[in-house]
Curated annotation (Swiss-Prot):
Residues 27-190 are annotated as: Disordered. It comes from Human cytomegalovirus (strain AD169) (HHV-5). Belongs to the herpesviridae cytoplasmic envelopment protein 3 family. The gene is UL99. It comes from the Viruses. Residues 80-90 have a biased composition (Basic and acidic residues). The keyword Ribonucleoprotein does not apply. InterPro entries: HSV_CEP3_betahv. It is a lipid-anchor. A lipid is attached at G2 (N-myristoyl glycine). Residues 108-123 have a biased composition (Basic residues). Its main location: virion. This is Cytoplasmic envelopment protein 3. Plays an important role in the cytoplasmic envelopment of tegument proteins and capsids during the assembly and egress processes. Also participates in viral entry at the fusion step probably by regulating the core fusion machinery.
Length: 190
């Protein structure tokens, strides 16, 4: 069962067992082991910001514990694999430094640094939304041009310019049509 969970975790990171785990930016993720640290130990400091992340964190850590040494992404610098046990006598929790992991909550000092950035992000996103709205108004002008009436092409025959004709051409044009060129309609065969 441990190997199956290991495969699931490796699939979550987008790698196969035996390959190092990498985050979304392509950096190698090191899985570290730590002993006897409850998953909610650092979350006691900041309970006012609890969004149910502890439940997700515990589930993820449980999966990582069951994975044990079957993962190929364990800390590659040490070369040794630690095994997780299910009996509770010795539990090695494997925690990832991957950004999407629900790691234990940071200390109060780092929260103070993050709060202004969240507020700034909110201001920035609202400003971006306003500029997007303005952009939509501006681009709507350009995206829908006024309808153009269809152009009707009228073929007008321009009069032929007067060209100097030779006396022979003038004579030919003044002659009446010859009877051989005109055929009567009654003589047509069916």
């Amino acid at each position: 069962m441990g190997a199956e969970l290991c495969k699931r975790i490796c699939c979550e990171f987008g790698t196969t067992p035996g390959e190092p785990l990498k985050d979304a930016l392509g950096r190698q993720v090191s899985l570290r082991s730590y002993d006897n640290i409850p998953p909610t130990s650092s979350s006691d400091e900041g309970e006012d910001d609890d969004d149910g992340e502890d439940d997700d964190n515990e589930e993820r850590q449980q999966k990582l514990r069951l994975c044990g040494s079957g993962c190929g992404g364990n800390d590659s610098s040490s070369g040794s694999h630690r095994e997780a046990t299910h009996d509770g006598s010795k539990k090695n929790a494997v925690r990832s430094t991957f950004r999407e992991d629900k790691a234990p909550k940071p200390s109060k000092q780092s929260k103070k640094k993050k709060k202004p950035s969240k507020h700034h992000h909110h201001q920035q996103s609202s400003i971006m939304q306003e500029t997007d709205d303005l952009d939509e108004e501006d681009t709507s002008i350009y995206l829908s041009p006024p309808p153009v009436p269809p152009v009707q092409v009228v073929a007008k025959r321009l009069p032929r310019p007067d060209t100097p004709r030779t006396p022979r051409q003038k004579k030919i044009s003044q002659r009446p049509p010859t009877p051989g060129t005109k055929k009567p309609a009654a003589s047509l065969p069916f």
